[in-house]
Amino acid sequence: MVSVDRQRAGNGNGHLIELRQVVKVYENAAGGFRALNGIDLSIDRSEFVGIIGRSGSGKSTLMNMITGIDRPTSGEVRVGDTPVHQLSENQMARWRGRNLGIVFQFFQLLPTLSVLENVTLPMDFCRAWPLRERRTRALALLEMVDMAEHAYKLPAALSGGQQQRVAIARSLANDPPLIIADEPTGNLDSKTADAVFALFESLTAEGKTVIMVTHDTALAQRIPRTVMIADGEMVPPTPAGAEAEGQG
């Protein structure tokens, strides 16, 4: 039986994430579009990795493979000891809730729930924490992102940057080892974007693995490791910072 328990160790090769010869083909009227072509990628625990590339390059498809939102046409996707590409839909939901925190560009907070309720929601879904501990944990996470004083407000009362901070707190609700951030600073001013970036840096220092998709060239140059995707393939590494220079 495929394990969907919390991933606390890497796989047999010591990596938290490993993609092996991942191919993704989308069928269309013309026959088929190859969005990913033989991707081999390994990411270790506590790494902060940026995924960069032009629109349509395949970077979003790559993230969908890692999160299990989509499945490869061929190849393997492993996170810890779990073959993500082999999970059933029910197993996928459980695995994702326990092992993965996702931060989107547009926050996606539920508008009718308070900030505190938005953060406790993943805990309620996965039942990973005792009921009596959930509120305390949510408040601690909001304190970490400097949003505890807004705990009982609705999202509409917050600025975009504040909502993104809440979204980060929510992504940490079940203490996942892996955080996926898809253009998390895309709609933020530079000062707020810097603060959000600093939060991700602190998470890797605490042992989390963070993968960030970004078009922000200045931000990409600050990420310790970047992976460039072009035409569905990984571009060979170039000197530090050079990967970001071609991103418009």
Q: Which residues does each predicted region cover?
A:
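ABC-family P-loop ATPase nucleotide-binding domain
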Residues: M1-V25, P236-G248
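ABC family nucleotide-binding domain
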Residues: G14-A230
